[in-house]
Amino acid sequence: MLELSNELAALRKELLRLRGDRTVYPDATIVIPVNTQKDLKNICQLLSDLAKYSDRKRIEIVLVINNYPANDPPKEIKMYQHMGLTVIDIPHVEHVGGIAIAARIPGIKVANSSKIILFDADCRIPDPTALINWYIQQFDDNYDLAYTHVNYTDLPPGISVKVRMFVHHASRWFRRQILGIPTSRGSNYAVRKKFILQLFAEGRIPYDIHVGPAVKSTGGKIAYSGAKELVVLTSGRFFAPGWKVLIEYLLWRTGYYRRILKAKPKKAVIEQ
């Protein structure tokens, strides 16, 4: 048996509590892709946040640990299995579009719940009880996709970074409120298992940013909340300050939306 530090042993106890009776299906499954090159240190913070969930719902957590040499798997695979998590280990994720959504799919396939909640490994969740309960309630209210506001943590100081954040949030508000385009993103959304697996199999969601428009095009119901207690924080540690960097970002972002969103999703029928 693996020996855990006192801190990890305490976390294991809470994660086992979170899952509850394994002979009973979970109320929801959280799937988190873990890139071994950058996420192994971050995932414990997110797991600690999730372990603070204090209600009675049974929550399954699936980690998809990926991007490592096939002959040298990280020791954390066995550690997280010992901590009560379901772990899918894939040395190399085959992908056509974004690697992030491709890495989520194996975890979604093995989920024991049809209610899938998706986070990135570097996220922080200030109020996991409110957020998880809200997501489960949206499923119970027959929504097919739900998402909440995402803000940033670990941002570098500087006016240029603040301007970048303003532009980022303003553009998302404009797309959501004025253009009616769902702005769910990979670091924080919930979707029905059948929806995302079928859309991915059809090649209609090569990136997470396609999920909202694709679900909408099928007639799926979509819920959004900007409530403060439901906010998820994602890391801005890779952002660099400076006006030159800001201009380059704006040019890149404009080109990104043109490349990724130029093709509107075709009408599709989701099997019931």
Regions found by a protein language model. Name each.
Residues 1-49:
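N-proximal low-complexity "stem/linker" segments adjacent to membrane-targeting elements
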Residues 47-92:
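Acidic donor-binding segment of Leloir-type glycosyltransferases
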Residues 93-111:
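Glycine-rich, basic loop-to-helix element that forms the pyrophosphate-binding segment
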Residues 114-124:
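Short beta-strand-to-loop acidic/aromatic patch adjacent to the donor-nucleotide binding site
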Residues 130-145:
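Conserved donor-nucleotide/metal-binding helix-loop-beta segment in metal-dependent transferases, i.e.
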Residues 146-159:
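Short beta-strand-to-loop element that shapes/binds the nucleotide-sugar donor at the catalytic cleft/hinge
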Residues 205-213:
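Acidic donor-binding loop at a coil-to-helix junction in glycosyltransferase catalytic cores
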Residues 225-244:
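Active-site donor/metal-binding and catalytic loop motifs
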